Amino acid sequence: MVNRPIMNTLPSHLVINAAIEKKFGAKYKLAKSAFLWGSVVPDIPLGLISIGYFVYYRFFTTQDVSGIMDKAFGEMYFNNPFWIASHNFLHSPTVLIIYAILLWRFVDKIGTRGHWWLSFVFGCMVHSVIDILTHYDDGPVLFFPFDWHTRFYSPVSYWDRAHYANEFFWVELGINIVLLGYLFLPKFIQRFSKPK
């Protein structure tokens, strides 16, 4: 059993996508809200399944719940088809590329629903790339829905101390501070440098 600290990278995903959108959003005609939603929505299905799994075992069975989440992420996450599909339909690079191909006709149709969804998929792609690079052996399934098990083995894990999680915490914190400065410092300086 790996000692899992309580980690939540959703804020980092959101900050990274917001910085990308600020720098490149106008140039590549991204729908801002869609791109930002794409930074956080991929993790929601797994979160909901995990909560449901815990609630079920805690309140509707007589089984001991100690270690239940280790079972969830040690067995269900890797082997249960529902868990795999739920987590990867917005994480797998293969399925995201398929979505982008299907939606590509909307790339220049700004303001349409199709353009919004294409921007959302681009946001999910950024999320997926970050997850692939920051999960030792539990990142997105690369070729889902064609293959349900192949994952990239990153040398770094944002949560696993055996794979530099303690060091990565500081890298992630630094990235967030720099990007938050990029996002908000110019507005802050402008606001307080106006003559009264």
Question: Where do the language-model regions lie?
Answer:
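N-terminal membrane-targeting hydrophobic helices
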Residues: 2-196
